A protein has these predicted regions:
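Basic, Lys/Arg- and aromatic-enriched nucleic-acid-binding interface segment
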Residues: 1-43, 47
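Short, polar N-cap/turn motifs at the start of nucleic acid-interacting alpha helices
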Residues: 52-58, 145-146, 165-184
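Conserved tyrosine-mediated DNA breakage-rejoining catalytic core shared by Y-recombinases
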Residues: 48-83
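DNA/chromatin major-groove-contacting recognition/catalytic segments
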Residues: 14, 71-76, 80, 84-85, ...
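Active-site/catalytic core of tyrosine-dependent DNA strand-transfer enzymes
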Residues: 6-13, 75-145
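Catalytic-site neighborhood detector that most strongly recognizes the C-terminal catalytic loop/helix
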Residues: 6, 63-67, 174-199
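Short, basic (Lys/Arg/His-rich) helix/loop patches that form interaction surfaces
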Residues: 17-24, 123-124, 132-172
Length: 204
């Protein structure tokens, strides 16, 4: 079933094809899958992903944790989720920030205006709490340990490893650059290589 760090292929396919009959649960499922399809993108980066960062057939974003800039090619799965949750009145690619705003004390914030960083961070925290509760219910229905966005991230890495993808490619896909030797090696990898890795992994 699920381990604490990754979701096995059987359960992943069950999750991806499951209609939970409730829009909130289906949305949480899609946010989990988006993270997986986007090379294990961190939930905080999903929250802060603006529509202006989608161009040239790719998502371009700066990791909140490291401030490094990454690009992820738009796969059919990513396009489908983005289209499903597109809100013409929102500056965000995904509904995460809106969910956080609706869960916070300040529900009147103009998301198209100059929102204070502290408010955005609060919305992110509330959104994370919101989705984790829903993922816990999804986990119960699937009969496995609790799903989190870290599980999506580790699942991507685990599947890439099982396909024989070199560790440096996996590190680049996840945005890991903490080890000096890995950083030196990754400098020679281009985006196309990493996108090809992601295409292989997400065709499960």
């Amino acid at each position: 079933c699920c381990s604490y760090t990754n979701l096995n292929i059987k359960k992943y396919r069950t999750l991806a094809g499951r209609d939970f009959g409730e829009s909130e649960l289906n949305e949480a499922r899609d946010m989990f899958l988006f993270s997986f399809y986007a090379r294990g993108m961190s939930f905080v980066d999903m929250c802060y992903l603006r529509k202006t960062k989608v161009w040239n057939e790719a998502l371009h974003y700066e990791r909140q944790k490291t401030h490094q800039v990454f690009s992820v090619a738009l796969t059919p799965q990513l396009r489908e989720i983005i289209f499903r949750y597109d809100d013409p009145g929102s500056p965000w690619v995904l509904p995460c920030m809106q969910r956080g705003m609706l869960s916070s004390a300040n529900k009147q914030e103009d998301m198209n205006g100059d929102v204070p960083p502290a408010s955005l961070y609060n919305f992110y925290c509330m959104a994370l709490h919101y989705y984790l509760i829903l993922l816990k219910e999804i986990s119960r229905r699937l009969g496995c340990r609790n799903l989190t966005f870290n599980v999506a991230r580790h699942t991507w890495a685990t599947e890439a490893r099982s396909m024989g993808v070199p560790t440096p490619h996996i590190s680049e896909g996840l945005g890991h650059t903490s080890e000096r030797t890995t950083r030196i090696y990754l400098a020679s990898l281009d985006r196309q290589t990493v996108d090809e890795v992601n295409e292989r992994v997400t065709k499960l």
